[in-house]
Design a protein with these regions (language model features):
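Glycine-rich beta-strand-to-loop/alpha-helix junction loops that act as flexible
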Residues: 29-31
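Short hydrophobic/aromatic beta-strand micro-patches
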Residues: 46-48
């Protein structure tokens, strides 16, 4: 899958997720953001959610929601209150990734 197709798949996925959850932000990060992807690379998508008490349940649900999209999508959920530059993983996403639009 090329970068344009990966971005389209990730954007469609985020649009579907936003129908079920209140999203604060969403980002593509990892190999597609850094332009070092391969044909079999996964599409890392950070999903920043509002008002989520149990991230484990959300993670499972996010994996199920991707069945209508490309299975290469690898969702990474975050609470909006935890998504800040003090976390090295979040800092990497913010520095190397790029933000996806959230459907309103």
């Amino acid at each position: 899958m090329d970068k344009r197709e990966a971005i389209m798949a990730a954007q469609n996925y985020v649009n579907n997720v936003s129908k079920k959850y209140e999203l604060a932000q969403a980002f593509i990060f990892g190999s597609y953001a850094k332009n070092n992807y391969r044909a079999d690379s996964d599409i890392d998508v950070a999903i920043v959610l509002k008002n989520i008490p149990n991230l484990f349940d959300v993670q499972v649900d996010l994996l199920h929601l991707r069945k209508d999209e490309d299975l290469q999508i690898e969702p990474h959920p975050f609470r909006d209150t935890d998504f800040n530059r003090d976390d090295p993983f979040v800092n990497e996403i913010l520095q190397a990734g790029f933000e996806l639009k959230i459907a309103v």
